[in-house]
Amino acid sequence: INWLKLGKKMMSAL
């Protein structure tokens, strides 16, 4: 799992 990509996606969702 790519945490950097996942974190960025979650940040964009907020």
Swiss-Prot record:
PTM characteristics: C-terminal amidation is important for activity, since the deamidated MP-9 analog shows an important decrease in both antimicrobial and hemolytic activities.
Molecular functions per Gene Ontology: toxin activity
Keywords: Amidation, G-protein coupled receptor impairing toxin, Mast cell degranulation, Membrane, Secreted, Target cell membrane, Target membrane, Toxin
Localization (cell): Secreted; Target cell membrane
Gene Ontology CC entries for this record: extracellular region; membrane; other organism cell membrane
Pfam families named in the record: Mastoparan_2 (PF08251)
Family: Belongs to the MCD family. Mastoparan subfamily.
More info: Most of synthetic analogs show a decreased antimicrobial and hemolytic activity.
The protein's name in its UniProt record: Mastoparan MP
Annotated organism of origin: Mischocyttarus phthisicus
Lineage of producing organism: Eukaryota, Metazoa, Ecdysozoa, Arthropoda, Hexapoda
